[in-house]
Amino acid sequence: MAAADGDDSLYPIAVLIDELRNEDVQLRLNSIKKLSTIALALGVERTRSELLPFLTDTIYDEDEVLLALAEQLGTFTTLVGGPEYVHCLLPPLESLATVEETVVRDKAVESLRAISHEHSPSDLEAHFVPLVKRLAGGDWFTSRTSACGLFSVCYPRVSSAVKAELRQYFRNLCSDDTPMVRRAAASKLGEFAKVLELDNVKSEIIPMFSNLASDEQDSVRLLAVEACVNIAQLLPQEDLEALVMPTLRQAAEDKSWRVRYMVADKFTELQKAVGPEITKTDLVPAFQNLMKDCEAEVRAAASHKVKEFCENLSADCRENVIMTQILPCIKELVSDANQHVKSALASVIMGLSPILGKDNTIEHLLPLFLAQLKDECPEVRLNIISNLDCVNEVIGIRQLSQSLLPAIVELAEDAKWRVRLAIIEYMPLLAGQLGVEFFDEKLNSLCMAWLVDHVYAIREAATSNLKKLVEKFGKEWAHATIIPKVLAMSGDPNYLHRMTTLFCINVLSEVCGQDITTKHMLPTVLRMAGDPVANVRFNVAKSLQKIGPILDNSTLQSEVKPILEKLTQDQDVDVKYFAQEALTVLSLA
């Protein structure tokens, strides 16, 4: 920076002020991003006495600039002289925490939380707590909202008198007139509870929690559900029934589906927090109701949690609860009218197999899996197929294979290319589970069909799929079943299919090794150097470059080099370029 020039040490601040006042927002943004450089040049004293006051006074800019400023100030502790001066950063951050734009306020709060840890206890009480109080008592809801996120970081390190004040301020925010503030308080209630003493959690947090959980606004009530998880973790088991469960029961039956959705979404966390006894008496019936909820979003959220909820049930009653109380609800969800619900269930239902064991899986789950494999919604079928490994470990896949096949074939030919892509990605896994005979008989032709799909992404995925299959089944299998079919495509009238032969050879050569590549695949590549389409010819050059390292030197010299040299004389500029590149890379030039 120019400050290094000695006498003209005012230069950087002058530039900054100029650029900060420039009409071009990009220049202002750049100067804010260079703030640490400028602070370094000014030194800690002038940063404190000139730069920070200047920044505090000029907070009236574009949100983008303010966001950058809020972020920078969070890392400024050393630039103002270390922890004993860190309180100098509070005024500009306090201003930023009151602006209208939420993103800027959130970033300012994040920076304030970060620097709070660098305050000594006495500085917290002298500087940080007054800031929290000012924000919490501010006229605008924006400042009161920001205050909510600052209580938990300063509470643990202040005196008990100040702690009492902070609790009172937080209580006021929980009953603020503005829903936005109550929302912010509800969202921070859990983390504030974590730093409170247990007696205060019982005497003060619980009443706040109960009030927020019965707020008139559903957006506040649903945030109280999140806090419920944290609060339940803090309380001893014997207090849960009286202090938390009434509120949780009420939330699980709330008139707003968004609150019930939040209960379903947090269900397994709640389950862990309240423990096995309350789970058995309260949460199992609540879970049944959520799975039967009239709102599809809620049923889908509950469906997502089925496997985890069942896993977490205590071992002594797990099987009984699942078979008598959960499974009947699952059976209804399998034929739900909403495809998101069915898809959510299909993504986890296979996970019940290991929990219930072989006999129950065959008798009770298998019929459900088979029904889902025939579902009209591709996502449902796909989710079942992609989770087959759970079932395979318990009952072996043979039980499913007869129904699997039609489902796989339909997905493999689905009109949506993303569905086709997803099934290709599961093919190596399926192949490994079904075994080579089944694969050759039933699935091989599908894998070949994908190589000539009209969507490039499918052809590309199908090519790497071949490589994974060879890794599973071995190169002898590749030589006998895959390579002849791949090489046959080199004579296809469609040049895209001829190019696919080259792409396949590129990946197959890696797994098949020198012998098979030299004897069986190389001759086809060399022959294709005479293809009428330039795109094919330059891909021949690229293929030779790719497989060259696998071949031995005499083959490279006697067979590959002459062909590449011939291609360097091609009339097409791309063919020449790639042929020359291949010669250079293979050190044949």
From Swiss-Prot:
Gene Ontology BP annotations: chromosome segregation; female meiotic nuclear division; meiotic sister chromatid cohesion, centromeric; meiotic spindle elongation; mitotic sister chromatid separation; negative regulation of hippo signaling; negative regulation of phosphatidylinositol 3-kinase/protein kinase B signal transduction; positive regulation of extrinsic apoptotic signaling pathway in absence of ligand
Per-repeat ranges for HEAT: 8-46, 47-84, 85-123, 124-161, 162-200, 201-239, 240-278, 279-321, 322-360, 361-399, 400-438, 439-477, 478-516, 517-555, 556-589
Subcellular location: Cytoplasm; Nucleus; Chromosome; Chromosome, Centromere
Keywords of the record: Acetylation, Cell membrane, Cell projection, Centromere, Chromosome, Chromosome partition, Cytoplasm, Membrane, Nucleus, Repeat
Keyword check for Repeat: yes
A single MF term (Gene Ontology): protein phosphatase regulator activity
Annotated signal peptide: none
InterPro entries for the chain: ARM-like (IPR011989), ARM-type_fold (IPR016024), HEAT (IPR000357), HEAT_type_2 (IPR021133), PP2A/SF3B1-like_HEAT (IPR054573), PP2A_Regulatory_Subunit_A (IPR051023)
Residues with N-acetylalanine modification: 2
GO cellular component annotations of the record: chromatin; chromosome, centromeric region; cytosol; dendrite; FAR/SIN/STRIPAK complex; glutamatergic synapse; INTAC complex; lateral plasma membrane
Modified residues (N6-acetyllysine): 280
TM segment ranges: none
Entry domain remark: Each HEAT repeat appears to consist of two alpha helices joined by a hydrophilic region, the intrarepeat loop. The repeat units may be arranged laterally to form a rod-like structure.
Subunit structure, interactors included: PP2A consists of a common heterodimeric core enzyme, composed of PPP2CA a 36 kDa catalytic subunit (subunit C) and PPP2R1A a 65 kDa constant regulatory subunit (PR65 or subunit A), that associates with a variety of regulatory subunits. Proteins that associate with the core dimer include three families of regulatory subunits B (the R2/B/PR55/B55, R3/B''/PR72/PR130/PR59 and R5/B'/B56 families), the 48 kDa variable regulatory subunit, viral proteins, and cell signaling molecules. Found in a complex with at least ARL2, PPP2CB, PPP2R1A, PPP2R2A, PPP2R5E and TBCD.
Family stated for the protein in its record: Belongs to the phosphatase 2A regulatory subunit A family.
Function: The PR65 subunit of protein phosphatase 2A serves as a scaffolding molecule to coordinate the assembly of the catalytic subunit and a variable regulatory B subunit. Upon interaction with GNA12 promotes dephosphorylation of microtubule associated protein TAU/MAPT. Required for proper chromosome segregation and for centromeric localization of SGO1 in mitosis. Together with RACK1 adapter, mediates dephosphorylation of AKT1 at 'Ser-473', preventing AKT1 activation and AKT-mTOR signaling pathway. Dephosphorylation of AKT1 is essential for regulatory T-cells (Treg) homeostasis and stability.
Protein name from the UniProt record: Serine/threonine-protein phosphatase 2A 65 kDa regulatory subunit A alpha isoform
Organism: Mus musculus (Mouse)
